[in-house]
Regions:
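Glycine-rich FAD pyrophosphate-binding loop
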Residues: 17, 22-47
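C-terminal catalytic lobe of FAD-dependent flavoproteins
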Residues: 313-370
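Beta1/beta-strand and adjacent pyrophosphate-binding region of the FAD-binding site
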Residues: 1-13, 29
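Active-site/ligand-binding neighborhood in enzyme catalytic cores
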Residues: 85-226, 230, 237
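A conserved beta-strand/loop capping segment in the N-terminal third of enzymes
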Residues: 39-52, 59-113, 171-176
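Mid-domain catalytic core of redox enzymes
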Residues: 24, 214-333
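Short, well-ordered alpha-helix to beta-strand connector turns
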Residues: 3, 25, 205, 223-225, ...
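Short, solvent-exposed loop/turn segments at secondary-structure junctions
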Residues: 12-13, 35-37, 99, 153, ...
Length: 370
């Protein structure tokens, strides 16, 4: 059978493109080298708890069309992301707000917190030369040392003084007692998990798992008129310009015989001597679902940053000048392709929130299918 589109990758971008193509009457085949669909938003039921296998994913957006599109395939709960950060056995609210400032300095009034931050920001004069100077110029020395430095150095595997300033464009600071991490109008998590959502997106579409496109490229390229490729763009071109760099992650998941382990969905650990960056307790994502919250067990995941090497799962692009220039070479080469569309975080070598991924997929499909 000849397909109109071969979609490489059953993650959010690939699933959305495939769904829209099928809706337009196109013949679509979706393949994925993993044994499951949904990519990194894959959720798996463990004793009644939807476990986010590749780290916490909270859907949030201000994009009305994207929100309505997502709601075609899932009913979202009202989960509000309010993470905590642990530093030297004390807990601080994220993002930085009046609860954070009270815990750190004992201040209760917004103007008191502003005065401290403004005074500490003045330590940096001129254009920040690295991540450390950038962070201090935004939030001051105290917050940087307690809540930014250790976490960032673990996440990127390098001292903050060696990291480029542009990694942190901004650090959200609120002078209210609002613990909601996101400012977006819409926020939540699918009641049935992300895997069920992607299953509905792919309903009626042929899906083949455990198929590595790069290993079977010769035969696969013959069965479709066009390819939508969501894998690493450098690997598509056999790394002809060199390998793009990534950061990887390692997850250690435990099923514990207690009803509640930490009382919150996500607690970051900013201590430099603690190897993991955060602990996720998955049942707390099930907002309003008493049957889940009251289960006599819980599932927690420790998230460890890791250096990436060939063969490892790539998670975050390393957005420095070297990799940016290298990606630009691949982007220009890809621009000359007539029958290949590159999309998603790996195909575009950029970090994408879920709503950004859906927006990119919707726009791409709309342009392609018009």
């Amino acid at each position: 059978m000849k397909y109109d589109y071969l979609v490489v990758g059953a993650g959010l971008f690939g699933a959305a493109f495939a769904q829209m193509a099928k809706e337009k009457g196109k013949r679509v085949l979706v393949i994925d080298k993993r044994s499951h669909i949904a990519g990194n938003i894959y959720t798996e039921d463990v004793g009644g708890i939807a476990v986010h296998r590749y780290g916490a994913h909270i859907f949030h957006t201000d994009d009305e069309e994207v929100w309505q599109y997502a709601n075609r395939f899932a009913t979202f709960n009202r989960f509000t992301n309010a993470p905590l950060a642990k530093y030297q056995d004390r807990l601080y609210h994220m993002p930085f707000n009046m609860n954070t400032f009270y815990a750190m300095w004992g201040v209760t009034k917004p103007n008191e917190a502003r005065e401290i931050i403004e005074r500490q920001r003045k330590e940096i004069t001129g254009e920040p030369k690295n991540l450390e100077e950038q962070a201090i110029s935004l939030v001051g020395r105290d917050i940087y040392e307690a809540l930014v430095r250790g976490y960032s150095e673990k996440q990127w595997g390098r001292p903050c003084r060696e990291l480029p300033a542009f990694i942190i464009r901004r650090l959200p600071v609120r002078f209210t007692y609002d613990n909601n991490y996101f400012n977006d109008r819409y926020q939540g998590i699918p009641d049935a998990g992300y895997t069920a959502m992607v299953e509905k997106m792919l309903d009626g579409i042929e899906v083949r798992l455990n198929v590595d496109f790069l290993q079977h490229r010769a035969e696969l390229t013959k069965i479709a008129d066009k390819i939508v490729y969501t894998g690493p763009i450098d690997q598509y071109y056999d790394q002809c310009f060199g390998a793009l760099n990534y950061r990887s992650l390692r997850f250690e998941t435990r099923d514990l015989p207690v009803q509640d382990y930490q009382g919150n969905a996500v607690i970051n650990d900013t201590n430099a001597d603690v190897p993991y960056t955060r602990v996720i307790e998955h049942k707390h994502f099930a907002y309003g679902q008493a049957d889940v919250l009251n289960l006599p067990h819980t599932v927690v995941t420790y998230e460890y940053p890791a250096d990436w090497k060939q063969g490892d799962e790539p998670y975050y692009p390393v957005n420095d000048a070297k990799n940016g220039a290298l990606y630009e070479q691949y982007r220009q080469k890809a621009a000359g392709e007539r029958n290949v569309i590159f999309g998603g975080r790996l195909g575009q070598y950029r970090y994408l929130d879920m709503d950004d991924t859906l927006r990119a997929a919707i726009d791409c499909a709309r342009k392609e299918l018009q």
